[in-house]
UniProtKB/Swiss-Prot annotation:
Biological process, per Gene Ontology: mismatch repair
Protein name: DNA mismatch repair protein MutL
Species of provenance: Bacillus mycoides (strain KBAB4)
Keyword DNA damage assigned: yes
UniProt similarity note: Belongs to the DNA mismatch repair MutL/HexB family.
Length: 644
């Protein structure tokens, strides 16, 4: 007898379940997606012990006909595709026909379903074996219960995490599905306690508000773009609202939540230098495209996809986000906690500014000595001395703050997570949703005022680190190092992008010794390094020498810049000339900028603020830290109880 044998269906289902049903969250995902494919508009999810004891999904969808109930639990049985052509034009969430038999093979499953045209069907399955099938009275839709998950696979059960962790995985999946399909009302219960309820009215802002809070929803800006192949819609937070994890970014492709690192990277690139290192935005991006352009048949879990025009999509995402941020002022409000203000037309009046357009990048003309004393005379190229600013004689109108209650960005030591349980305090569902709709409806669109910085008039300096300035719109606090870092960065970024013939010879050639692997890596990229003005000559078997450098290299930092470029070339799998220039410009701008505890004269402060206004992004340094924080006059009045 031969050694190779065909496995029976039950064993095959157990093997398939290892990929499809990894944990309770996998069961919830597959069953809820089936409900959505069945045109459900309302879905209830009931859990006990984070789904390990019981998972129950109730929907009002199309239901399953009696003759299809048994077939639905056979391997690769599906109503969603018929031939290989359908496989490349998938519009549904499910299509493989693996989920139901896999779930049934590792649990005790009970199904009650009806199409509404005939009596319902009651089906009981244990470990893949059909125990009972009978007709029953049932409303239209499907009610499916999964109990004792992994009862017959103790090895899999042993690797389950704590109840809290498994519940977190489930809520994370349900949140993503809720964002993907705001037109479907979702209710999530755990041990009879309600964790989530969405209205199903199609407004994704309400879903985002119910998941992340009204305060976060107020800091969202809409994103929308369209090309020949792609349509993008969504919301992302202002740069001041960040989290310590990428888990707050959700990407949806043709209604399907997917985990795709390159899409998340594109969102981050869209923020460019607006985000601090190690911080990530909250974002929801829905992408619609021809199914022929995306392959969803990559993994049984259907969370991974491949794009046939990936680079075009990534470029569209980056450009769309960058364009959106250029249209708004990104000065974070310091904010004070206030009660919900009355709607006052005077409060809602926004100050308008007329600014000069940023001029072509040039090296900042502020002359600052490395060591400075308050009593020393300093040199500055400002033609007119700064004078204390006198406010115009006019009746003050408090400006509108985007969100009074929101605090400016602060790195939180305990960031909130998507997996945090949320309990709804009201027992009246309609009241809860009406209240949420009202709050979301009151969220005002963030005004697109352009990216110009209003004129600022210095009034002082604190600890040789922070500059205080004012204008009609209130008080501004500026980080002087971050401000000049932004000025220098835009200067060096422009210079690094040019290959100039003007070079400075080194008195002693700089020698770079590398390992053989590093040497070969750098040797491959010699032409790329020339594009940033760095010319290397081979010297021996594993070394290079540099005899000259561009004249714009900051004096005394030549070798550090060369070493930084070498490190980037060795570290990156594929050298990106744009990133190489970026890293070099960031490093040079940081080292060339004034530091903390360095006192400036009024003229130097005024010159610094004027230079800052000429930059294309005066709101964050190249590392993403905020340059300035705004206290509106209205907020200051509130702090001192001058207005109520």
């Amino acid at each position: 007898m031969g050694k190779i044998r065909k496995l029976d269906d039950q064993l095959s289902n157990l093997i398939a379940a290892g990929e499809v049903v990894e944990r309770p969250a996998s069961v919830v995902k597959e069953l809820v997606e089936n409900s959505i494919d069945a045109n459900s508009t309302s879905i209830e999810i009931h859990l006990e012990e984070a789904g390990l004891s019981k998972i129950r999904i109730i929907d009002n969808g199309d239901g399953i006909a009696e003759e299809d109930c048994i077939v639905a639990f056979e391997r690769h049985a599906t109503s969603k595709i018929k031939d290989e052509n359908d496989l490349f034009r998938i519009r549904t969430l499910g299509f493989r026909g693996e989920a139901l038999p896999s779930i049934a093979s590792v649990s005790e499953l009970e199904l009650i379903t009806s199409t509404g045209d005939a009596p319902g069907t009651h089906l009981s399955i244990k470990g893949g074996d059909i125990i009972k099938q009978e007709k029953t009275a049932s409303r239209k839709g499907t009610d499916i219960t999964v109990q004792n998950l992994f009862f017959n696979t103790p090895a899999r059960l042993k690797y389950m995490k704590t109840i809290h962790t498994e519940l977190g995985n489930i809520t994370d999946i349900v949140y993503r599905i809720a964002m993907s399909h705001p037109e479907v009302s979702l209710k999530l219960f755990h041990n009879e306690k309600k964790l989530l309820h969405t209205s199903g009215n199609g407004d994704v802002r309400q879903v985002l508000a119910s998941i992340y809070s009204i305060q976060v929803a107020k800091k969202l800006i809409p994103i929308e773009a369209e090309s020949l192949d792609f349509t993008i819609k969504g919301y992302v937070t202002l740069p001041e609202v960040t989290r310590a994890s990428r888990n707050y970014m959700s990407t949806i492709v043709n209604g399907r939540y997917v985990r795709n690192f390159v899409l998340m990277k594109a969102i981050q690139q869209g923020y460019h230098t607006l985000l601090p290192i190690g911080r990530y935005p909250i974002g929801f991006l829905s992408i619609e495209m021809d199914p022929m352009l995306v392959d969803v048949n990559v993994h049984p879990a259907k969370l991974e996809v491949r794009f046939s025009k990936e680079q075009e999509l990534l470029k569209l995402i980056e450009e769309t986000l960058q364009s959106a941020f250029k249209k708004i002022q990104l000065i974070p409000d310091a904010g004070v906690t206030t009660k919900k203000k009355e709607k006052d037309e005077s409060v809602q009046e926004q100050f308008k500014f007329e600014h000069t357009k940023p001029r072509e990048s040039s090296m900042p003309n502020i002359v600052l000595p490395t060591g400075m004393d308050e009593k020393q005379e300093e040199t500055t190229t400002v033609k007119q001395p700064a004078q204390l600013w006198q406010p115009p004689k006019q009746e003050w109108q408090p400006p509108q703050s985007l969100v009074r209650e929101e605090q400016s960005w602060q790195p939180s030591s305990k960031p909130e997570t998507v997996r945090e349980e949320k309990e709804w305090t009201s027992n009246d569902d309609d009241f809860e949703l009406e209240e949420l709709e009202e709050e979301v409806g009151e969220i005002e669109e963030i005004e697109m005022n352009g990216n110009d910085l209003p004129p600022l008039y210095p009034i002082g300096q604190m600890h040789g680190t922070y500059i205080f300035a004012q204008n009609d719109n209130g008080l501004y606090m500026i980080d002087q190092h971050a401000a000049q870092e932004r000025i220098n960065y835009e200067y060096f970024r422009d210079k690094v992008g040019r290959v100039t013939q003007e070079v400075q010879e080194l008195l002693v050639p700089y020698r770079i010794d590398l390992s053989l692997t590093e040497f070969l890596r750098v040797e491959e990229q010699l032409e790329e390094l020339k594009k940033v003005g760095l010319f290397l000559e081979q010297f021996g078997h594993q070394s290079f020498i540099v005899r000259s450098h561009p004249t714009w290299f900051p004096k005394g930092q030549e070798t550090e810049i060369i070493d930084e470029m070498m490190e980037q070339v060795v570290k990156l799998k594929k050298v990106d000339i744009k990133k190489l220039r970026e890293e070099a410009a960031i490093m040079m701008s940081c080292k060339a900028s004034i530091k903390a505890n360095q006192y400036l004269t009024n003229d130097q402060i005024f010159a610094l603020l004027e230079e800052l206004r000429t930059t294309t992004n005066p709101y964050t340094c190249p590392h993403g830290r905020p340059i300035l924080v705004h206290h509106s006059t209205y907020e200051l009045e509130k702090m001192f109880k001058r207005v109520m």
